[in-house]
């Protein structure tokens, strides 16, 4: 396997494992795929849910794991035990900014409100030109089909630019998704492409 263009990838995913075994397997598969490509992991910390599965797989594979977690969520009762390096932050805003700062790309596994919020924020940042990093959606068993249908409806109704729809890179398996991310070239029209953005501009 050729050398990856990425050193670290941020993975967004659920703090629960979901009801299907396929979600569990996909998290481990993604962790193993990162290891195979010599990519380190950035994630939201803890050892529960899909977050715990992907981080443990990367850690067991000998790659570096960075868990970024608000101090208020660091108790084992809430998040379990983070493997690898723990980077405490003050709040959720700092968590997202730090994860973005440390990463070369983003991938979302199945998850709930938190995962959706993190995913949509980095998509928005890409649209604005704040970053040029690929955003991948691991669409396990069609989990995100309804979200993609909604986004397509927003394009149809004129709320999302057609070129901005291309920000999202989607695939059903980790290997296929990683192959697509490796080849990704930004070609959408950024809203603020002439601005030199830094994380400080985000108010974090």
Curated annotation (Swiss-Prot):
Catalytic activity field: N(6)-(dimethylallyl)adenosine 5'-phosphate + H2O = N(6)-dimethylallyladenine + D-ribose 5-phosphate; 9-ribosyl-trans-zeatin 5'-phosphate + H2O = trans-zeatin + D-ribose 5-phosphate
Binding, substrate: 77, 95-96, 112-118, 124
UniProt cross-references to Gene3D superfamilies, sorted A to Z: 3.40.50.450
InterPro entries listed in its UniProt record: LOG (IPR005269), LOG_fam (IPR031100)
Class of this enzyme: hydrolase
Pfam families: Lysine_decarbox (PF03641)
Tissues with expression: Expressed in roots, leaves, stems, tiller buds, shoot apex, immature inflorescences and flowers.
GO cellular component terms, semicolon-separated: cytosol; nucleus
BP GO annotations: cytokinin biosynthetic process
Listed EC numbers: 3.2.2.n1
Keywords: Cytokinin biosynthesis, Hydrolase
One term of GO molecular function: cytokinin riboside 5'-monophosphate phosphoribohydrolase activity
Membrane-crossing segments per the record: none
NCBIfam families: Rossman fold protein, TIGR00730 family
Annotated function: Cytokinin-activating enzyme working in the direct activation pathway. Phosphoribohydrolase that converts inactive cytokinin nucleotides to the biologically active free-base forms.
Membership in a protein family: Belongs to the LOG family.
Name used for this protein in its record: Probable cytokinin riboside 5'-monophosphate phosphoribohydrolase LOGL10
């Amino acid at each position: 396997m050729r050398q990856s263009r990425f050193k670290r990838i941020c993975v967004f995913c659920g703090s629960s494992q979901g009801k299907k075994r396929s979600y569990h397997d996909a998290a481990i598969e993604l962790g193993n795929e990162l290891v195979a490509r010599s990519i380190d992991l950035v994630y939201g910390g803890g050892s529960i849910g899909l977050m715990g599965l992907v981080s443990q797989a990367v850690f067991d594979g000998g790659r570096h794991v960075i868990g970024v977690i608000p101090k208020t969520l660091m108790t084992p009762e809430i998040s379990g035990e983070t493997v690898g390096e723990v980077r405490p932050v003050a709040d959720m805003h700092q968590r997202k900014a730090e994860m973005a700062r440390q990463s070369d790309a983003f991938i979302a596994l199945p998850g709930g409100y938190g995962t959706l919020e993190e995913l949509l924020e980095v998509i928005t940042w890409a649209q604005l030109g704040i970053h040029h990093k690929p955003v991948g959606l691991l669409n396990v068993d069609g989990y995100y089909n309804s979200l993609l249908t909604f986004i397509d409806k927003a394009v149809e109704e004129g709320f999302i630019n057609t070129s901005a729809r291309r920000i999202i890179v989607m695939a059903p398996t980790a290997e296929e998704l990683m192959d697509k991310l490796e080849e990704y070239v930004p070609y959408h029209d950024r809203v603020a492409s002439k601005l030199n953005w830094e994380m400080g501009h985000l108010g974090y």
